[in-house]
A protein has these predicted regions:
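Conserved beta-strand/short-helix segments
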Residues: 22-510
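Extracellular carbohydrate-recognition regions
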Residues: 509-521
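Bacterial N-terminal signal peptides
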Residues: 8-19
Length: 529
């Protein structure tokens, strides 16, 4: 299968992942207790059956699709067979309530049951590879964007980089929300024009770029041709699209390219909206994880652009964060997250380099946080985090700390908090998630903690990659965000069939505080209260 991977939007955080080998099989996943929920295709009330390679949970997005004040959760399974086509992909949507996640109210989408897609399901399309949620048409209901980056629409001429064949052009579905939820009869499909290709929909985000109250749709195309370095190279592009009253998506302006990037830079590999511009004005960040910086190949960089005119506001490399250095294959810009960690009203930007050799340990990973200011993102006000900041065992080779990021106000104190996925952490890539609180002085390094599947009532599994995908949103409408954790390599009904955990108010002091451990596994198949 082609490579997979994470992206974010303010408040609504989405993610996707890179698959690895799967391990031994485990049992099905039930839905819920008072603190945590767990869902797979084998959960009671969920349509479908887990099968090997489904990768359920490979993409996640929270949005309020029915406008009831409680967030809803979209889950991508890009390896799902649909219409008899292997790896065609499908998306599940579970609706939230004051009681949390309920598997009884769901919708399932694939390319065969949505209008406007003449090609329908095809093997290898991977519909649901990336997801994003937000209100694009301004009607008060969030809409859902679904990326299908490996859709086959032959691209004429040229050679393709990005380890993709030239027919991996891709497209994006936009399903509109309503009082009854997502409306499968009201769908737009955006496809590249002419010879433009390059895995459209590999990353997605929705946010308001022009201040009119309606969200723009940001589409990452990391394998696309662009004018760069005095020529046309496959460095990647990013497009911001707005909803037009005639029922179409139109460009909001800007070039959609970074003129300073080279062939195979993969700009648009990850994207994020935020108030990154002067005075907190809206802009977007895009990661180019393969960009060469100061002679270091594939060390990566992040560009911040004004989405309306395409002006490059800032380019960030690891050397912009104090004494941090660039090295080949760091992949800085692999994952991005937006949050106001110090509560000053200006958005801050977290950017990961999960293959960074921290303290000499290969591919252990680092995350860089640049704080916002009245003049925009200020990399001179920064923090650098790694596993070493959490005490306990030191970093190990292949931890990939920061391979997924999610930001939101998890503890309800008014400051955004930051979660880090480390899917390679633990024996045989079991995976861990790390967490730090926000505060008036920023992220509180030294007061964070980590957890794994057993912390949430599950069981360790080799190669599960717990934490490969993260997302945050307010599932129960109480004003504080929940965390969703995708485990797309989990063996529920077959190797790498996948599952998703959702947890709220996680705190080391209450993880066993609601009594579920005394009841054994029974609560984990109970109906959520």
């Amino acid at each position: 299968m082609p490579q997979r991977l994470s992206t974010t939007v303010p408040i609504l955080v989405v993610g996707f992942f890179v698959p690895f080998a799967a391990g031994a099989q485990t049992g099905a996943c039930g839905v819920g207790n008072v603190r945590n929920w767990c869902v797979s295709q084998d959960s009671a009330g969920v349509t479908g059956v887990s099968q090997a390679g489904d990768h359920f949970g490979a993409a996640l997005a929270f949005g309020d699709f029915d406008g009831d004040g409680a967030g809803d959760l979209a889950v991508g399974a890009p390896g799902e067979s649909a219409g008899g086509a292997a790896n065609a992909g499908a998306v599940w949507v579970f609706y939230g309530s004051a009681a949390g996640l309920h598997a009884g109210r769901e919708q399932v989408f694939d390319q065969d049951n949505l209008p406007g897609d003449d090609g329908g399901t095809e093997s290898g399309d991977q519909f649901g590879f990336a997801l994003a949620a937000g209100d694009v048409d301004g009607d008060g209901f969030d809409d859902l964007a679904i990326g299908t980056p490996f859709e086959n629409q032959p691209e004429p001429g040229g050679t393709c980089g990005f380890d993709l064949s030239c027919d991996d052009v891709g497209h994006v579905h936009l399903i509109f929300g309503s009082a009854s939820g997502l409306d499968a009869g009201r769908v737009l499909v955006h496809t590249p024009e002419g010879s433009e290709g390059g895995a459209e929909g590999y990353s997605l985000a929705i946010g308001d770029l022009d201040g009119d109250g309606d969200g723009e749709l940001l589409i990452g195309k990391p394998g696309s041709m662009a004018v760069s370095l005095g020529g046309t190279v496959r460095s990647g592009r990013v497009f911001a699209l707005r909803y037009h009253g005639s029922g179409t998506l139109v460009g909001s302006g800007g070039s959609g390219q970074d003129p300073d990037l080279e062939e195979d830079a993969q700009w648009g590999f990850a994207v994020a909206f935020g108030g990154f511009g002067p005075g907190g004005s809206a802009a977007y960040a895009a990661g180019a994880r393969h960009s060469t910086v100061a002679g270091s190949t594939r060390t990566g960089r992040v560009s911040i652009q004004d989405g309306l005119d395409g002006e490059n506001l800032l380019e960030l490399a690891q050397t912009d964060y104090g004494s941090a250095g660039n090295a080949a294959e760091d992949h800085f810009g692999f994952a991005l997250a937006t949050g106001d960690f110090d509560g000053d009203g200006f958005d801050d930007l977290a950017a990961a380099a999960p293959e960074k050799n921290d303290a000499g340990v290969g591919d252990s990973g680092r995350v860089y946080v640049a704080y916002g200011s009245p003049s925009g993102i200020d990399p001179s006000q920064f923090q650098i985090l790694s596993i070493a900041d959490f005490g306990g065992n030191p970093p190990d080779t292949g931890d990939r700390f920061g391979a997924a990021l999610a930001a939101g106000d998890y503890d309800g104190d008014g400051f955004d908090d930051l979660f880090f996925g480390s899917p390679g952490r633990g024996n045989d890539d079991r995976g861990f998630v790390y967490f730090v609180h926000g505060s008036a002085s920023g992220l509180v390094i030294g007061a964070g903690f980590n957890f794994s599947e057993p912390s949430l009532g599950g069981a360790f599994q080799e190669d599960a990659l717990f934490g490969a995908v993260l997302a945050m949103g307010d599932l129960d409408g109480d004003g504080a965000d929940e965390l969703a954790i995708g485990v797309p390599e989990k063996d529920t009904g077959g190797n790498a069939s996948g599952l998703v955990y959702v947890t709220r108010r996680f705190n080391p002091n209450w993880i066993f505080g609601d009594g579920f451990e005394s009841a054994g596994p029974a609560l984990w198949s109970a109906t959520a209260p």
